[in-house]
């Protein structure tokens, strides 16, 4: 194990929709990497129980996607509350990264952060205030060097752990083909 303030916390949430005032978290996963994007540990992958009423109100895209990937069934079978999932995630992170050291890392991570602030505030407070958002590089590449976008394809399973792994690979791809640090 390598507890280090340079380690990066990667997180992804799946939600019932995009509005944190109306929607809720249904899955959370985390991965810790070192500063060079080498995976050190995968945290718990947790389906968060939500009511049938809330699940039935999801839009067509969410219904289709989360049915096809099995997430709705996992959510229905889960007994975990958002608070329990938050505490399990924090227990994992405390073994790898000190509080306030890592930016929140992922793709379109500001959206996840909005839900964390509302439903998992202790976890939201664990991160540094900065964001490491892979989608920023994708947007810049689309404008400045669009040809490199064709070299990275996502699976788009919309399962939290898969999405994090893809985000890490995507950042490594941009580091090699767009940023060229060598």
Swiss-Prot record:
Q: Where in the cell is it found?
A: Cytoplasm
Q: What is its main location?
A: cytoplasm
Q: Mind telling me which residue stretches traverse the membrane in this protein?
A: none
Q: Which UniProt keywords apply?
A: Cytoplasm, Exonuclease, Hydrolase, Nuclease
Per the UniProt record, which EC number(s) apply here? 3.1.15.-
* Protein family (similarity comment): Belongs to the oligoribonuclease family.
Where would I find the Exonuclease domain in this sequence? 8-171
Question: Where along the chain is the active site annotated?
Answer: 129
Name of the protein described by the UniProt record: Oligoribonuclease
Q: Which organism is it from?
A: Haemophilus influenzae (strain PittGG)
Q: Which CDD domains match?
A: Orn (cd06135)
Gene Ontology process terms (BP): DNA metabolic process
